[in-house]
Amino acid sequence: MKQYIVALMLACSIQGHSQDVKQATFVSPFDFTLTLSGNFGEIRANHFHGGLDFKTQGVIGKPVRALADGYISRIRVTNGSGHVLDVVYNNGYTTINRHLSGFMPDIARRVEKLQYEKEDWEVEIVPEPGEYP
């Protein structure tokens, strides 16, 4: 009984420690109603889908907005995901934007230059924080 009381007192005295809940406000990445074309966790041929895919009303090249203030932390072109931008937000969250039809002109020029230098379609650039806000 003594052990039970000691254990109960110990359990009651331990404070729960967890991460603080982040409060964040995001905007839509598009200026039109969001419609999903691919869901997170959806079964694919050899894996589960790891993101959300949005329909763009059948139009290629629609502008994609950042969800909040932040900066581009990685720029990639890959065979599987095409044009990719990783964004770090000031609130601590990140997004990976895949399957983009292209990049803004200054980023596109930098990517194309690197592709010619490497003689390779697949490239990766890690800009300095704040270089592309």
PLM regions and their residue ranges:
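Surface-exposed, glycine-biased beta-strand/turn segments
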Residues: 18-133
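Positively charged n-region of N-terminal signal peptides that target proteins for export
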Residues: 1-4, 19
